[in-house]
């Protein structure tokens, strides 16, 4: 399970 990182953070 990946941490809830926002797509904009990528």
Curated annotation (Swiss-Prot):
It catalyses: (R)-amygdalin + H2O = (R)-prunasin + D-glucose. One of its GO terms (molecular function) is amygdalin beta-glucosidase activity. Transmembrane segments: none annotated. The keyword Hydrolase applies. Glycosylated. It is an enzyme of class 3 (hydrolase). Its EC number is 3.2.1.117. Keywords: Glycoprotein, Glycosidase, Hydrolase. Monomer. This is Amygdalin beta-glucosidase 2.
């Amino acid at each position: 399970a990946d941490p809830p990182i926002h797509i904009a953070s990528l």
